[in-house]
């Protein structure tokens, strides 16, 4: 029988960081609150073990995520933001740069860096994903961080 290794939704220990994009702050603040709540519900004392770093926008997320993950101070880093489609191709560029950069930060450092950036066609969709009809994607990102950090710990033991 094959051995199964998976992360758990229990406190893996260590510190966590949220890197939040200030652009569309009225949405992102809800994502940050949802993430904080999810971490607390899973045993992380966010008063002492969570740092929240604000950057101007989604394009700036990867650089700070990379820096925090490479510092060795964090068990997981969570990137949160909201990119809402406009009438130009700028949306596609921002989404692509942010997603690839966050993935690269995780791969390059070996630290879970979770992509919790909303990429929506409308403000209404963003609001739905920030805590109304579609749940809170910030909370989902927080859970992914806990599970991935737990999985990394399991793989190292």
Where on the chain are the PLM-derived regions?
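Glycine-rich phosphate/diphosphate-binding loop of Rossmann-like nucleotide-binding domains
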Residues: 4-56
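C-terminal binding/interaction regions
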Residues: 5, 91-92, 96-157
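Generic structural signal for well-ordered, non-membrane alpha-helical segments
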Residues: 9, 24, 28, 58-61, ...
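Short, ordered loop/turn segments at secondary-structure junctions
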Residues: 22-23, 81-83, 118-122
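Amphipathic, non-transmembrane alpha-helical secondary structure
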Residues: 29, 33, 62-66, 70, ...
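Short beta-strand segments at enzyme active-site cores
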Residues: 52, 75-80, 112-118
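Glycine-rich oxoanion-binding loops at beta->alpha junctions
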Residues: 53-71, 117-118, 122-123
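Glycine-rich phosphate-binding loop
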Residues: 60-102, 157
């Amino acid at each position: 029988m094959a051995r199964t290794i998976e992360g758990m939704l229990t406190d893996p220990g260590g510190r966590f960081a949220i890197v939040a994009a200030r652009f569309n702050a009225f949405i992102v603040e809800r994502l940050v609150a949802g993430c904080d709540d999810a971490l607390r519900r899973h045993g992380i004392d966010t008063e002492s073990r969570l740092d929240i770093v604000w950057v101007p926008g989604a394009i700036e997320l990867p650089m700070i995520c990379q820096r925090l993950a490479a510092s060795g101070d964090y068990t997981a880093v969570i990137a949160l933001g909201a990119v809402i489609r406009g009438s130009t191709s700028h949306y596609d560029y921002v989404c692509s740069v942010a997603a690839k950069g966050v993935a690269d930060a995780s791969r390059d450092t070996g630290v879970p860096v979770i992509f919790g950036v909303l990429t929506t066609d409308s403000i209404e969709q963003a609001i739905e994903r920030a805590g109304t009809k579609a749940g809170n994607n910030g909370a989902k990102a927080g859970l992914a961080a806990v599970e991935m950090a737990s999985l990394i710990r399991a793989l190292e033991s």
